[in-house]
Amino acid sequence: RANTYVDVGVDGIMIHSKKNTPDEIFEFSKIFRKNHKFIPLVSVPSTYNAVTEDELVKNGFNIVIYANQMLRAAYPAMHKVAESILKNGRSLEVDKDLIKIKKILELIPGTK
């Protein structure tokens, strides 16, 4: 299928795997790179998260997308804050765990 995409002018190929090792995507990249040396290959290592970016590059990948790690990290923190607010009826107890509003606003251009 990837060869067909390349034939019709695709700009790059993103491959994903539900397996917990990169073996499947490395096998694909080895075969794909024989015929397509310059088409960008994109990896999304959500399940095979022990693989390093260096290993991906050595196996022919050009782009790595960490598609959901930030969301998965944020959810437990948000859950903890919500539980504390419900328990205490206020947010004072979680202030120590929160970024200051001023710091958040500084992230937005033009709000300093």
Regions found by a protein language model. Name each.
Residues R1-Y66, R72-S84, T111:
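Alpha/beta enzyme core
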Residues I85-K112:
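Flexible C-terminal active-site loop/helix
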